[in-house]
Amino acid sequence: FPAFARLFSRCDIVMARPKIYPYNLYTDYCKCHIESDLLTARQVIAEKYPAYLPDFDRVFFRNNRLSHFNMFVLPRERFEAYSAWLFDILFEVERRIEIQDDPVQGRVMGYLSERLLSVWVRHNRLKICYKTVLMVNDQKRKGLGKHLFHTTVNTLAYWITYPLRRRSPRRAAE
């Protein structure tokens, strides 16, 4: 896929554009989920991957941005490294916690993995390209055509004017 090759020449991972919260990710998790599950994940990381603990604390206590949906693109080698790290942690967390019989809290492993991706990316100092995720459902389907039209027009305008921007005197002087 040539598009991915070009993309990965500029970054190491592609992630969903982050949501910005008015508080840190620890507070967000505790408001929406079970705090002890997160603290168990932190304990597992402290035991199995202690070098990641400062990054865990930074992501959860000094950060208010989160890329949701567990959607990302990585080169295969990095994906395999991330998966080995993540599932080693999640399987141990699963052994230690009581998974709730609740449609929301029962998805605890998904919620943890969304957040642990940021820990892994930070620890490995990956350069991120953020992309917008387009959600399509019955209510939004009517607006999709308009959105795609504007996206297409903006993309075409960008690429049509690209040669002009490359030759502009301002860019030549830079």
PLM ranges: what are they?
Residues 1-174:
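ER/Golgi luminal nucleotide-sugar-dependent glycosyltransferases, focusing on the catalytic module
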